[in-house]
């Protein structure tokens, strides 16, 4: 479904005056639906390129690249009086916090709600299709949102992602209430508000982060590390994502095949003529010289937890899995992974200790705490 760019209902915000008007109207709203578009597939340092907000039948497409200072938007995002509706909010929040320092309070995530209700298809498109028969055109999902001017079709796409979020929230919220899961959902929404910003340095460049790296010989790992560092530096200089310089699979193929000339290098899968023309000699030299390196970065080895911790973790996981099957929801809806790991590691000995560990999850503590403590103490399997 394409949303027409009717100037009566769709407002392009690209200067201080239109931003001021937008914020004044949003201050009067009880809830706003929010989405963002970024350019992570096209640059080294990604950035938020659009912020879309729908409220009270109006949609605002805010252009951070042209508008300038967006700090007053924080009054909307941090207001406990205005509900912010997102779908799959985690990435949006991390990027908005990184780029603008926004804070968030009073949030509803339709993807989290759908998971908690046991929906099997939780993408926004399938949810709208299944719940309301609304079809979203997703062809611009991976578009370069950093280009200007944006086409009319891209703007229509941007508006469509927030246009129906309030309607979806109403339906999912009613179901959560009916199933008595509102309190658990609210816990997850509040935890989401406290998520950390995305890192300002976005990429790791270590050989063990590359799929297949741990299976290589030490010499091959050295060569792979050299290629990782070269790729990272070149990506920064050219302002491109590292994979557009050289893919992970191409780097592994290079170190495994150990080519001695550009002709052999060119024939490797994932390399090709364009890479060889630009980087051929450099790649061959790195592949050769880094094999002889005596020291390269190494991963920090994790100490094996004590047997008691491992046993407690497995008991908790088994209980969580069975409870998820019983309630027809993913297991981490029952108990988030990070909290499970903390409980397994600490091993609470009484209600008070467990309540402290689950301080951000009071609803789950009251619902499942007694059983969790039994399992932690190994009083019941």
Model-identified regions with their sequence ranges:
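Active-site-proximal helix-loop-helix substrate-binding element of RNase H-like nuclease domains
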Residues: 4-5, 52, 57-72, 76-166, ...
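N-terminal accessory regions of nucleic-acid-interacting proteins
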Residues: 1-32, 36
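Flexible glycine-rich surface loops and low-complexity tracts that mediate binding to linear polymers
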Residues: 36, 87-88, 354
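Non-catalytic, usually N-terminal nucleic-acid engagement modules in DNA/RNA processing proteins
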Residues: 33, 42, 50-53
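Helix N-cap/beta->alpha junction signal
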Residues: 15, 88-89, 247, 336
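Short beta-turn/strand-loop junction motif enriched in small, turn-promoting residues
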Residues: 37-39, 113, 270
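Accessory DNA-binding and partner-docking regions appended to nucleic-acid-acting proteins
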Residues: 152, 172-381
